[in-house]
Amino acid sequence: FRNYLSACLNKDFVHFDLSLQPEILKECLVPENYPDGCWPSPHTASLMQQFAVNTVSKELSGEKQEGIFSVNGPPGTGKTTLLRDIIAAILVKRAKKMVNFTEPAKAFRKIGEVQVSEKYTPSIYEPDSSICDGGIVVASSNNGAVENISKELPLKKEARGYSDQVGYFRQVSEECVGEESWGLIAA
């Protein structure tokens, strides 16, 4: 938030106009700047969508892992498509860190217990901090749009043709969503 206000109030802050400075666009779109993953889709991102995905991915990969990004546009212009690719990039980045654990259970640490009844006291675990980075918040003045994204993206139909090959906490996701899903990505 501080960065946003600083940019708005600081007259010395440099704003880029990509139509006047296409070299910025070209630099961002070299293959080395693409994230390691994208959403399984028969369609590729448009030029400006890919620029946005690469920019957000780079910012979220930085040391501070912070930034405010605005995506505006009328319905049907690819905002959800853009968000899908950003989510895919985050998931792949986490997966690359998760393979470093010798077994899945080592990615979690017991932090407590909750006594639900006399005979049932489940444990509470927290994930290792190395797999918790890159979180995003999706906000909109249209709460229905955000709710739709949160409910739709985990569904199997959203991973067209790949839903049997991909899984991200699938069992937990199906318990939360109440129907077949490929992964848990929104809360």
Which residues fall in each region the model found?
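Helicase P-loop NTPase motor core of nucleic-acid translocases
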Residues: 1-187
